[in-house]
Amino acid sequence: MTVTTSSPATAPGRTPGIGRVARVIGPVVDVEFAPDELPEIYQALQVDRTIGDETLTLTLEVAQHIGDNTVRAISMQQTDGLVRGAPVHDTGAPISVPVGDATKGHVFNVLGTPLDVKQIEAETYWPIHRSAPAFDQLESKTEMFTTGIKVIDLLAPYVRGGKIGLFGGAGVGKTVIIQEMIRRVAKEFGGVSVFAGVGERTREGNDLFLEMTEAGVIEDTALVFGQMDEPPGTRLRVALGALTMAEYFRDVQKQDVLLFIDNIFRFTQAGSEVSTLLGRMPSAVGYQPTLADEMGVLQERITSTRGHSITSLQAIYVPADDLTDPAPATTFTHLDATTVLDRAISDLGIYPAVSPLDSNSRILDARYLGQEHYDTAREVQRILQRYKDLQDIIAILGIDELSEEDKILVNRARRIQRFLSQPFFVAEQFTGIPGKFVPLDETIDSFKRLTQGDFDHLPEQAFFMCGGIEDAEKNAENL
């Protein structure tokens, strides 16, 4: 498939020049220009390559000026068939992607070319390299982003315009949470979502697109993919392309946007590959010396401006489970909240399988949430932590060997654990249980009364897969 794009704008005051390919080493291409026609850093270049009878257009991005009127560029596609001396056209602008309503419901590559249809009718294109909002444009107050998901709102609340790290292995419900968040932003808040597949397996991206189509959330979502088999330049820039689409929805259409990045580690990994290709001296553990800078350029654009926000949910792979590795360690400094999915919880059939003890948020504080919310959350965590501490004793000696106080606490903890489950709208077709949106006030009140023992008389099973506490009481009547 030909993946071509034309830059919609030319830098003012300069006529784009034509150069020629001087050297090709994998995805790195050196291009010579006339002295007065040298393109700027991040400028997009285009060159044709021929494979058999087919001619395809490559897009390159200028990365370095190396002297002798030569620039070093990184290709966004495979360079097979590219020859020395081939003419290279300076587009006069950075790589640009379509923005606006035309992007909803479609899948794009890093160049803004649609992958699910032949073309789209986009009126506006924005360059992927943009400045972060000015300091005086930022939203100064810290505000909670209510999801309607009990376990998240109570124990690891999200920040509007913040960055959330999503930790989860295969099969624990990460994709379902992503789909549910997309659906809730669209239906409950009238917002839009943008998904960036960075270093995704092609199969996973295809599955996500089909599942989102079946779940009915694709109409409010734009997807941008740079698959695992594509050159590092593509994987390094695809997150910026998705972020640019999200910025348009925030700044021009004045919408609240949810931005998903899966996986942020692949962004760092691609940057390391590009850095090596450009001949830079590596830093710790072989990562690029510009690691913190590249991460900051991406993360600082994800923020709230006056009244509108981009809230980011980022899947994070931790190499060898080493949290001190420079890649995840650099990401952690930007996160406002972490949501940890636990396989042990999913094995119990409790979904969402969010760990109430491992997940956290910087705004889980009485100053931001109020004293009642904070005290309720801490009491829930205290009870669940005590239950966890007693697990070994229960397994060896049995629950009858516990003190009366601990028996009450264990039974209460099991009710809380099951009440943290919740039916999702996007899973309704599989579970047969209607999805539930639980208001924050109801969540706090329900768990406060649970910790005080107001519902100790209800059977454990009544709390499983229900929304508010009224659902649990109805379930108890039907048991």
UniProtKB/Swiss-Prot annotation:
Gene3D superfamilies attached to this UniProt entry: 2.40.10.170, Bovine Mitochondrial F1-atpase, Atp Synthase Beta Chain, Chain D, domain 3, P-loop containing nucleotide triphosphate hydrolases
CDD domains: ATP-synt_F1_beta_C (cd18110), ATP-synt_F1_beta_N (cd18115), F1-ATPase_beta_CD (cd01133)
Cellular compartment(s): Cell membrane
Regions annotated as coiled coil: none
GO MF term set: ATP binding; ATP hydrolysis activity; proton-transporting ATP synthase activity, rotational mechanism
Top EC class of this enzyme: translocase
One GO term describing the cellular component: plasma membrane
Claim: Ion transport is one of the keywords in the record: yes
Stated name of the protein: ATP synthase subunit beta
Higher taxonomy: Bacteria, Bacillati, Actinomycetota, Actinomycetes, Frankiales
